Amino acid sequence: MVRFTGLNPKQAQALELLKKHISLPDVEVAVAQSDETSISIKGEGGHYQLTYRKPHQLYRALSVLATALGEGDKVEIEEQAAYEELAYMADCSRNAVLNVASAKQMIEVLALMGYSTFELYMEDTYQIEGQPYFGYFRGAYSAEELQEIEAYAQQFDMTFVPCIQTLAHLSAFVKWGVKEVQELRDVEDILLIGEEKVYDLIDGMFATLSKLQTRKVNIGMDEAHLVGLGRYLILNGVVDRSLLMCQHLERVLDIADKYGFHCQMWSDMFFKLMSTDGQYDRDVEIPEETRVYLDRLKDRVTLVYWDYYQDSEEKYNRNFHNHHKISQDIAFAGGAWKWIGFTPNNHFSRLIAIEANKACRANDIKEVIVTGWGDNGGETAQFSILPSLQIWAELSYRNDLDCLSAHFKTNTGLSVEDFMQIDLANLLPDLPDNLSGINPNRYVFYQDVLCPILDQYMTPEQDKPHFAQAAEILSDIKEKAGNYAYLFETQAQLNAILSSKVDVGRRIREAYKVGDKVSLQQIAREELPKLRSEIETFHKLFSHQWMKENKVFGLDTVDIRMGGLLQRIKRAESRIEAYLAGQLDRIEELEVEILPFNDFYGDKDFAATTANQWHTIATASTIYTT
């Protein structure tokens, strides 16, 4: 049994909690804090000296030691973290609200990787006293739940940071058609700047957060593209919208000051409002009146430059240069791609992390946040992007990925090469590595079999065997994945469905066109019922995955989506049977020519595309309408 000296009681308790993840052999480890290198481990013959600079780094050091002792007796390792703060932010606003048990599990793994900070992105998913519609039926965290999560992070000397919204991205709240909510609204999902009741709401946000020990918060304010152009415009006329942003920011910062918080905010709106074409990555000319405001506010807020797309260091460097025109207090947010359907893209996350890390180091950035967004339903599993998180940890502490697989296996029990096979539903053989967002996992699954509006973005002769092989690979990995087996079981079933579904709509049309009623009958009576059965199995597996990781709220959306898909397959069966029985002289849906869904990659030599909004994949009809 391992014997430690130099641990305080809290550290000893934390190590007990981590025993389920890592184990050390019968050795002696002398632990001490040092103001020099981040992590230093030296020794042999069962006796080791371990030092750490910041308390949270102890747990990575022990993981690194466990890895090293698995390879040999003599250990001599030094690591120097490039970033003072390395954070992971879990999105809890796109229906999937991480449950408390899973938040604790995530904190444990992050501690072993060397993260300093755990963040939760909560648009309306925390409770505010006196605001019953805020988080209504959305699984909003109580103050007690947030306190429990924070206390667990503190057990590992990690900081907990809430990420909220104080301007836009509040659609789940402002949709409610009651006066007390609508009077807070400017347009779309944006709050009405200047309305005093808005600042009462924001005060309530901070009142809830003040029950935590942390005094660091991200106040959001990103993607408020139409700010000042709805009710604000009617009430106040045309104004300089960059100045309007500054005025609102100052009011929010004043409220934050009242509760003792230091704020971060996403930086994009300043650039979008001051650039000539409304884009984030542009040079900007700052109007003088806005410059006066920014000079006054810049020391009160940290700007977070977020970028999940660039495949070269130079592109990040250019955007850092633009940010420094506004402020020197800049943090960086990269992405662990879990927002394009059921399947993540750790491979692309690795590519962009390597380049972003180079630029962050070159620009002396001291804080990096890895974001795990969950766009359009939070369907990707929370723990599916663990490889991306380990990649950023390795880049921070080592500036290379030489030990990535060994460290990852210590922390998860699975090699990173095996774990990253979870991406397979997105990794079609003909796709280049440097394109983001291409997501056949989602649009092949959700598209209709009678009205397959994305059919031309599939290459069945390539895709069908790819998905079938992926299902087999993932099933094999499931057997050795331990606590993470559920992830691979779900993905294996998804890939099996994709293999069945990728050509069925096309074959229905081809058989109908040539009058092949034998094939139509075989599809309607055998293939489509089998496909429904496969989807029902997937729904059960997905539901288990969801309930393991998240609160139940939000699962209703997936029930509706998959239930609709099943009913549409039944409709296809009945339409084909009616045609075969002579009850219909034609199937109208099969006579409509399929047009391009988009032209994003029209000049490329592959078929796949990006389609990430369920309501546009599932039907050409209107779901959102008046």
Describe each region flagged by the PLM.
Residues 1-25, 70, 108, 148-151, ...:
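Substrate-binding groove of N-acetylhexosamine-processing glycoside hydrolases
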Residues 2, 16-52:
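Short, well-ordered secondary-structure micro-motifs within conserved domains or adaptor modules
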Residues 5, 44-264, 331-334, 339, ...:
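Feature activates predominantly on carbohydrate-active enzymes
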Residues 8-11, 33-36, 56, 66, ...:
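Residues that cap or initiate secondary-structure elements
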Residues 9-13, 33-39, 50-60, 500-503:
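Short, surface-exposed beta-strand/loop "edge" segments at domain boundaries and coil↔beta transitions
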Residues 35, 44-46, 84, 297-299, ...:
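Residue-level preference for short coil/turn positions at secondary-structure junctions
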